[in-house]
From Swiss-Prot:
The keyword Ribonucleoprotein does not apply. May play a role in photosystem I and II biogenesis. This is Protein PsbN. Keywords: Chloroplast, Membrane, Plastid, Thylakoid, Transmembrane, Transmembrane helix. The chain crosses the membrane at residues 5-27. It comes from the Eukaryota. It comes from Gnetum gnemon. Its main location: plastid. One of its GO terms (biological process) is photosynthesis. HAMAP family: PSII_PsbN. It is a single-pass membrane protein. Coiled coil: none annotated.
Length: 43
């Protein structure tokens, strides 16, 4: 396997895993701990 293919596959896997983690953090169980700054301040 060429070096360019290996680098491309590695970067693609990294981006997919980071995207999956971001979606899990936003909508999964950890999202219950996130705070909404607009709900904290009353006008």
């Amino acid at each position: 396997m060429e070096t360019a293919n290996l680098v491309t596959i590695s970067i693609s896997c990294l981006l997919v895993s980071l995207t999956g983690y971001a979606i899990y953090t936003s909508f999964g169980r950890p999202s219950e701990q996130l705070k909404d700054p607009f709900e904290d301040h009353e006008d």
